């Protein structure tokens, strides 16, 4: 190689590298340009005909503006008893899903020889009875049928039931057993019409549809003066018969609503919903307003050729204006990850620019800068990417009108990633978000809201559209699936069942065939056709305020075990692990002053058993399911069980009579076993008061100073006074069956072990051996590790030859209870003791001697 005199040989090699770099630079950008620009012109969206109401021109003005009517009963709790063919029946699950969606309290039981208890303390326990199978009701054992009918008549409780055709039965016209009502089975109907009835609220009276299917398994009822048609079927010869019937109760005193079809038909399902609100609602609880919010997530995120272009943006603006014909003040909410702005081809980049130019026409909310998954990052990193996204919004003049944000894939919202919540509040001042993951993705009817760390979390809904659904002809399983969802299916009922619906869509659903615009246009048309629902829009902040005013019981989150849900496990922050067991297998739930501390200390002697770490300020108890510690969350609770053994337990005696503990414990540890200690409630109340009294005296509490004895507390009658509240707390733990009912709503009886307090005090080793066997633990010689202490007057642990007894506050002796006070307390607990006796005997459980004696004396 000849080197010119003007070129230093030492520069040749660097210049070669520079030339290569420049070449690669231009090659890269030329290839990048080939991949990205210019974009291919889009085909026009496929034209699909919109839904047309079959009675669009019909005049139903005679039925409008009718005052909504509700059933009135006599002194019953707002709860529903559901008697199912089986707890696993498909139709039964559909009933329960609707009850869950409407937040109705209910008890579901499979039909059996025995009815559940219907009354409590001179009140009816249920405001509505639902029997899944009307044949089972008609053929119920005589005693049970009389008992159920008597309850319904006395408390004016309506009964709902469903009846199905028997396919192989040759009889067509059948008289209902014990009634003048006639029914026709295996029928085919040509038209189904909503009949005038006070039952209807959502259903539009007069609405009808002609049935094109050839199903011939309908049950129809003949209408007479004692029976009113709610939903009417017209058969081929023109006769009209009831498909859903209201029995006015003139013959047997029991008002009924009988369905001649299951909930698979959308008109039947709406009628069932109307009937539920007629039976359980009132003017304050029920409303026809439904608030709809449509979020467009990831407006800049997506692969090239899948994103929106200029024409899509123009159409989006036009559709937003058009949707206001259906929904007052409607606006789309657009979520952004700024890093992906102008990341498409030429046409898509122009679409992004047009969107920014029209930013003021929409409501905007932040995701993460690069669509980051929150659980993978700490506070510092989350803070930095949120700042980047905020700077993008400021530079592009995006109107962030509300403190609302959505985490990509709802990551970090639930299960809670505390550091994301903190970063949200610091950078965006977020007060409202939404997720589809609380408490679980499915069933959708079970989704709820909660408030955590000052952020209101609302339930979010899906609409059957995802990032890959862009063309009518390529929809998975065919687009008929979406049409079915719109026309009386899941999407239609999402709005009916939820006062506030926040829908998740993606920008891809507004490109190409614009499936989202078709979906919501036709959903609104169908709702307008068939229902009296009033669709409205409001800000996320207003929705959060309304939601938690309507459902205040949901403010406190219901923590679940994240390791039991694969979706939750996949988005756990690194600080939480499912690799080891970190939740208890056993809960000793009390009540207080029954020997629960002694039981826990003895059980912990077993080498295969471990207890929670001690918690400062609450003695040895975690008190997670019964106090402020619950707000600290799942991660805090799991951290209190560091030792992995065969059985992990915790003891918190405050759980037993806490109104929320059973529900919260069942959500977190549904398979845990429970131990309840049965102590004479008279003696327990006396010990509880003496312990509290001594504590209050030591702190010179004015209530204690003015209360010379438990007698004074028991005579307190003013429900607002501090003494009365102490009275209620004192007596509460002894009302065993009252509190057991709550625990048995969430745990089976097989999960509960009852221990006699007297037996525990006298023969602790025997009790512990029995408990260990129930827990499937290896045998352990408790008798050699527990010794009676004459000086203490109770049994203590024996560790390495030394006696270890409980502290001074445990096992203390109090002055003898007076006979007069004992009789007063015995009288107060008489009914509770009787109920406990019956409960134990009915379930063939051991009855303590003190209970046998208490019931014998009363008799």
Swiss-Prot record:
EC number: 2.8.2.8, 3.-.-.-, 2.8.2.-
Annotated region (Heparan sulfate N-sulfotransferase 1), positions in chain: 576-859
Function: Essential bifunctional enzyme that catalyzes both the N-deacetylation and the N-sulfation of glucosamine (GlcNAc) of the glycosaminoglycan in heparan sulfate. Modifies the GlcNAc-GlcA disaccharide repeating sugar backbone to make N-sulfated heparosan, a prerequisite substrate for later modifications in heparin biosynthesis.
GO biological process, one term: heparin proteoglycan biosynthetic process
Gene Ontology terms, MF aspect: deacetylase activity; heparan sulfate N-sulfotransferase activity; hydrolase activity
Primary location: Golgi
Spans within the Cytoplasmic topological domain: 1-13
Stored PANTHER family: BIFUNCTIONAL HEPARAN SULFATE N-DEACETYLASE_N-SULFOTRANSFERASE, HEPARAN SULFATE SULFOTRANSFERASE
Gene Ontology cellular-component annotations: Golgi apparatus; Golgi membrane
Native species: Caenorhabditis briggsae
Pathway: Glycan metabolism; heparan sulfate biosynthesis; Glycan metabolism; heparin biosynthesis
Start and end residues of each stretch annotated as Heparan sulfate N-deacetylase 1: 34-575
Location in the cell: Golgi apparatus membrane
Catalysed reactions, as listed in the record: alpha-D-glucosaminyl-[heparan sulfate](n) + 3'-phosphoadenylyl sulfate = N-sulfo-alpha-D-glucosaminyl-[heparan sulfate](n) + adenosine 3',5'-bisphosphate + 2 H(+)
Quaternary structure and partners: Monomer.
Family the entry assigns: Belongs to the sulfotransferase 1 family. NDST subfamily.
Protein name: Bifunctional heparan sulfate N-deacetylase/N-sulfotransferase 1
Residues holding 3'-phosphoadenylyl sulfate: 593-597, 687, 810-814
Pfam entry (one): Sulfotransfer_1
Disulfide bond positions: 796-805
Keywords on record: Disulfide bond, Glycoprotein, Golgi apparatus, Hydrolase, Membrane, Multifunctional enzyme, Signal-anchor, Transferase, Transmembrane, Transmembrane helix
Organism lineage: Eukaryota, Metazoa, Ecdysozoa, Nematoda, Chromadorea
């Amino acid at each position: 190689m000849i080197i010119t005199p003007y070129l230093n040989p030492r520069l040749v090699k660097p210049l070669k590298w520079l030339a290569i770099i420049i070449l690669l630079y231009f090659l890269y950008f030329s290839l990048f340009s080939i991949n990205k620009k210019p974009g291919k012109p889009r085909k026009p969206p496929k034209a699909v005909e919109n839904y047309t109401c079959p009675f669009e021109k019909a005049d139903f003005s005679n039925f409008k503006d009718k005052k909504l009517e509700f059933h009135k009963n006599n002194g019953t709790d707002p709860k529903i008893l559901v008697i199912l063919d089986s707890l696993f029946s498909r139709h039964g699950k559909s009933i329960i899903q609707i009850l869950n969606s409407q937040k109705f309290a209910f008890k579901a039981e499979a039909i059996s020889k025995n009815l559940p208890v219907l009354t409590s303390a001179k009140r009816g326990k249920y405001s509505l009875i639902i029997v899944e199978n009307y044949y089972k009701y008609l053929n119920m054992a005589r005693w049970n049928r009389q008992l159920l009918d008597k309850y319904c008549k006395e408390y004016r409780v309506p009964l709902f039931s469903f009846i199905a055709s028997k396919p192989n039965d040759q009889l067509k016209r059948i008289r209902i057993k014990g009634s003048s009502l006639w029914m026709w089975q295996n029928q085919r109907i040509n038209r189904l019409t909503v009949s005038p009835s006070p039952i209807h609220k959502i259903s539009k009276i007069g609405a009808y549809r002609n049935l094109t299917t050839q199903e011939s398994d309908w049950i129809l009822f003949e209408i007479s003066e004692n029976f009113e048609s709610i939903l009417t079927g017209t058969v081929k010869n023109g006769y009209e018969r009831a498909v859903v019937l209201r029995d006015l109760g003139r013959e047997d005193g029991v008002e009924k609503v009988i369905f001649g079809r299951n909930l698979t038909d959308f008109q039947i399902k709406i009628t069932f919903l109307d009937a539920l609100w007629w039976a359980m609602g009132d003017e304050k609880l029920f409303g026809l307003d439904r608030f709809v919010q449509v979020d467009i997530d990831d407006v800049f995120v997506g692969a090239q050729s899948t994103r929106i272009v200029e024409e899509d943006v123009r159409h989006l603006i036009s559709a937003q204006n058009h949707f206001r014909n259906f929904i007052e003040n409607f606006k789309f909410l657009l979520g952004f990850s700024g890093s992906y702005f102008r990341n498409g081809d030429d046409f898509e980049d122009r679409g992004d620019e047009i969107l920014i130019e029209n930013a003021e026409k929409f409501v905007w909310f932040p995701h993460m800068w690069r669509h980051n998954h929150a659980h993978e990052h700490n506070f510092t990193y989350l803070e930095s990417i949120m700042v980047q996204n905020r700077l993008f919004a400021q530079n592009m003049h995006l109107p962030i009108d509300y403190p609302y944000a959505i985490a990509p894939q709802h990551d970090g919202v639930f299960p809670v990633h505390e550091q994301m919540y903190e970063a949200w509040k610091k950078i965006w001042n977020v007060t409202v978000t939404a997720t589809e993951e609380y408490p679980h993705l499915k069933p959708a009817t079970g989704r709820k809201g909660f408030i955590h760390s000052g952020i209101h979390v609302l339930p979010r809904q899906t609409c059957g559209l995802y990032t890959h659904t862009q063309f009518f002809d390529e929809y998975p399983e065919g687009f008929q699936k979406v049409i079915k969802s719109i026309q009386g299916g899941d999407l239609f009922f999402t709005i009916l069942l939820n006062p506030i619906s926040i829908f998740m869509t993606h920008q891809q659903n507004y490109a190409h065939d614009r499936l989202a615009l078709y979906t919501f246009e036709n959903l609104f048309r169908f709702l307008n056709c068939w229902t009296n629902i009033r669709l409205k829009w409001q800000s996320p902040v207003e929705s959060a305020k309304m939601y938690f005013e309507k459902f205040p019981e949901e403010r406190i989150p219901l923590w679940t075990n994240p390791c039991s849900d694969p979706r939750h496990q996949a988005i756990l922050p690194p600080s939480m692990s499912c690799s080891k067991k970190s939740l208890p297998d056993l809960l000793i739930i009390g009540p207080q002053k029954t020997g629960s501390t002694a039981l826990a200390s003895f059980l912990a002697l077993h080498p295969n058993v471990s207890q929670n770490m001690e918690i400062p300020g609450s003695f040895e108890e975690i008190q997670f399911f019964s106090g402020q510690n619950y707000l600290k969350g799942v991660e805090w609770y799991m951290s209190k069980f560091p030792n992995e053994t065969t059985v992990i337990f915790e003891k918190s005696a405050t759980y037993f009579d806490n109104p929320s503990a059973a529900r919260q414990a069942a959500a977190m540890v549904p398979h845990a076993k429970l131990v309840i200690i049965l102590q004479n409630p008279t003696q327990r109340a006396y010990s509880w008061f003496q312990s509290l009294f001594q504590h209050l005296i030591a702190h010179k509490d004015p209530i204690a100073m003015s209360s010379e004895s438990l007698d004074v507390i028991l005579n307190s009658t003013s429900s607002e006074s501090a003494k009365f509240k102490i009275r209620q707390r004192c007596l509460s733990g002894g009302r065993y069956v009252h509190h057991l009912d709550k625990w048995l709503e969430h745990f089976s009886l097989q999960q509960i072990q009852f221990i006699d307090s007297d037996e525990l005090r006298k023969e602790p080793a025997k009790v512990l051996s029995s408990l260990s066997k129930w827990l499937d633990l290896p045998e352990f010689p408790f008798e050699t590790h527990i010794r009676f202490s004459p000086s203490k007057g109770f049994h203590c642990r024996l560790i390495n030859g030394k006696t270890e007894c409980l502290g001074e506050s445990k096992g203390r002796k109090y002055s003898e209870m007076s006979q007069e006070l004992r009789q007063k307390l015995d009288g107060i607990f008489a009914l509770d003791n009787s109920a406990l006796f019956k409960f134990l005997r009915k379930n063939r459980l051991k009855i303590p001697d003190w209970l046998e004696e208490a019931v014998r004396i009363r008799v």
